[in-house]
């Protein structure tokens, strides 16, 4: 749920004008009820002003402590290193908190949409150049502080837009319990890795089944909690 606010002053310099919504919809054969036209104009104007306010805020990027948590041997895995087709996106090692923690000794893989500073992100695609984050996602920081060791990023489906496991530009991911069959998606590589016991935990993201589907295909229990042999979000 998103709520936008507006004031009368927003209209004085706002580029959204009456009739803009109707003009945008016309090529698609869609119309707006004239009785609702003003409401749509008000909403779009408010969205614009809210977006402008957010865009004007100073950027904040937390700087990861790469002295405490160095990234070791970041690489695209060799054919010999790969498992279940192309389950790994990148291999590397970031050792967790040397003082230990509740996840000490646990091995982690991260879906290749989760930012890790210094590790290129493929997003299962080849239509855009890989992007290398300069900061760690919050979940990465929390895992390391809790003592977990991160062993790499796992292959996800192309732009995460599939619940299969054959759309990634980096290659297919096979089901560890039935090789040659789908591992599900879009957290395809992560589900295969944790189901096979190669890592203890994999971290994914789920808006439309991207954890639930591969977890069910690979025989894992997905959870928002800490469970044995689970794919978590």
Protein language model features and the residues they cover:
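Terminal signal-anchor or tail-anchor transmembrane helices
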Residues: 1-3, 28
């Amino acid at each position: 749920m998103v709520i936008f606010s507006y004031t009368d002053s927003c209209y004085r310099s706002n580029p959204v004008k009456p009739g803009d919504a109707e003009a945008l919809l016309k090529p698609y054969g869609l119309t707006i009820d004239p009785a609702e036209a003003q409401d749509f104009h008000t909403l779009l104007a408010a969205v614009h002003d809210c977006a402008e306010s957010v865009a004007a805020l100073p950027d904040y990027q937390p700087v990861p402590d790469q002295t405490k948590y160095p990234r070791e041997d970041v690489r695209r895995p060799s054919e010999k290193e790969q498992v279940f087709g192309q389950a790994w996106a990148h291999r590397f090692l970031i050792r967790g908190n040397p003082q230990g923690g509740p996840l000490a000794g646990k091995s982690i893989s991260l879906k290749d949409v989760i930012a890790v500073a210094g590790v290129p992100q493929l997003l299962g695609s080849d239509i855009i150049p890989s992007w290398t984050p300069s900061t760690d996602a919050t979940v990465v920081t929390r895992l390391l502080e809790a003592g977990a060791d991160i062993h790499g990023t796992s292959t996800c489906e192309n732009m995460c837009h599939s619940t299969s496991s054959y759309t990634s530009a980096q290659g297919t991911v096979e089901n560890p319990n039935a090789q040659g069959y789908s591992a599900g998606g879009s957290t395809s590589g992560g589900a295969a890795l944790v189901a096979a016991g190669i890592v203890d935990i994999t971290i994914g993201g789920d808006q439309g089944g991207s954890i639930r589907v591969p977890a069910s295909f690979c025989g894992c229990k997905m959870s928002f909690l800490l469970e044995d042999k689970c794919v978590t979000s």
